[in-house]
Amino acid sequence: MFKTVGASAIISYNNKYIFEIQKSDKWNYNSSGEIEIGIGCIGGTIENSETPLETLQREVLEEISTNIEIIKWDHPFTVTSDLNVYDINPKNESRNLFFHWFGTKEPYRKCRICVFLGKVIGDPFPDDLLGVLITDIKLLMECLENDFSLNQCLEKGMKIISKEEIPLKAKIKEVGTVKTIRELYKNHKRRIKHLLK
């Protein structure tokens, strides 16, 4: 048996996507002493008796000060803790679930995150985040693959909306749902091809 512990969304905004820039207490230093900043999807932990969609709506409002429209989707799939991908029955899941993924390490192998597709309503501004990254998924995958810094990402055409200064020399790394998107991009691209246009 598994437990649903969180919800996140791949959120479109002006023909690109919005990704969170993690808070400084989650930054790491690599072996070269460079700061590594996690890039993830907007979302968070389920609280009390919330549904995944209720969690997502709350987190979106807290993190980017706006709401989202959930995009209709009826072909959900799962990414297992062993990184296998399978179709799942939409009747057994939250309405409009895009996919869910499981942790790859104990004790999280039986914990899942529900992922939805969304479209931002209005203009996002980081509230409970330092900033957000605006980019297309292909470019994000290229920058992650090449171990780029935020500055190099900006030179490639990404945009940052921030409320505090963020060290642009910091390297980016995928976390949470973005880590799963990267796995899908590498090995199961057909599952996300509609996001790559």
What residues fall within each predicted segment?
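Nudix hydrolase/Nudix homology domain
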Residues: I35-I37, W101, P107-K197
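N-terminal phosphate-binding loop and adjacent alpha-helix
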Residues: N48-T55
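Active-site segment of metal-dependent pyrophosphate-handling enzymes
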Residues: S65-G122
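Short catalytic/ligand-binding loop motif for oxyanion handling, primarily in non-cytosolic enzymes
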Residues: W27-N28, T78-L83, P124-D127, C143
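N-terminal strand-loop-strand
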Residues: M1-I42, L53, I68-E69
